[in-house]
Amino acid sequence: WETCKEFLKLSQLEIPQDGTSALRESSPEESHALRKKYGGFMKRYGGFMKKMDELYPQEPEEEAPAEILAKRYGGFMKKDAEEEEDALASSSDLLKELLGPGETETAAAPRGRDDEDVSKSHGGFMRALKGSPQLAQEAKMLQKRYGGFMRRVGRPEWWMDYQKRYGGFLKRFADSLPSDEEGESYS
């Protein structure tokens, strides 16, 4: 039914006989208000936007969403909004508590008291800790480890297993197998 009603509204708009749009003939105050409301888009889409504004007036929900939600849902959404604000406030308080007193202002500046604090430097490397061994152990577990590749020294374990399994079969009979160096080939 809504689409039919909209179609009737559109068909009832009067279009002047001279071919100009009735929407463009407006007072300068209205055009100034529309330019202020829509900005630079009025140059290109002005007539369309004005027509849409007439057909679909702005709903009161867009003007005051919190009040409408409170009325519509009986305060349910209002409670959620208040809880989100409380959560943001508590998280910022927690962050301030973790940073400690006086460090919120100087968080971006480099610190001079490395021996007192656990501080990060250069992309996540933890500096050495001086203090309780328990705190040092916890920080070591969290420490990021970046570095070079590990280099294997000696034979790999799978090679030893391979030698045990085949009992050195290839070593025993390596002399009796034809080699490519001797030039012997089977045709």
Curated annotation (Swiss-Prot):
UniProt main location, coarse: cytoplasm
Q: Where is this region: Disordered?
A: 81-132
Where does the record place it?
Cytoplasmic vesicle, Secretory vesicle, Chromaffin granule lumen; Secreted
Highest taxon of source:
Eukaryota
Q: Which InterPro entries match?
A: Opioid_neupept, Proenkphlin_A
Where in this protein does the record say Phosphoserine is found? 187
What is one term from the GO cellular component aspect held by the record?
neuronal cell body
Q: Determine if Coiled coil is one of this entry's keywords.
A: no
Where in the sequence does UniProt note compositional bias of the Basic and acidic residues kind? 111-120
The biological processes this protein is annotated with in GO are:
chemical synaptic transmission; neuropeptide signaling pathway; sensory perception
Q: In which residue ranges is the amino acid composition biased (Low complexity)? A: 88-99
Which residues belong to the propeptide? 52-70, 80-143, 153-163, 173-187
Per UniProt, the keywords (alphabetical) are: Cleavage on pair of basic residues, Cytoplasmic vesicle, Disulfide bond, Endorphin, Neuropeptide, Opioid peptide, Phosphoprotein, Secreted
Q: Name one GO molecular function term.
A: opioid peptide activity
On modification after translation, the UniProt record reads: The N-terminal domain contains 6 conserved cysteines thought to be involved in disulfide bonding and/or processing.
Q: What is this protein called?
A: Proenkephalin-A
Assigned protein family: Belongs to the opioid neuropeptide precursor family.
The answer to keyword Phosphoprotein applying to this record is yes
Q: Where is this site: Cleavage?
A: 49-51, 70-71, 150-152, 154-155
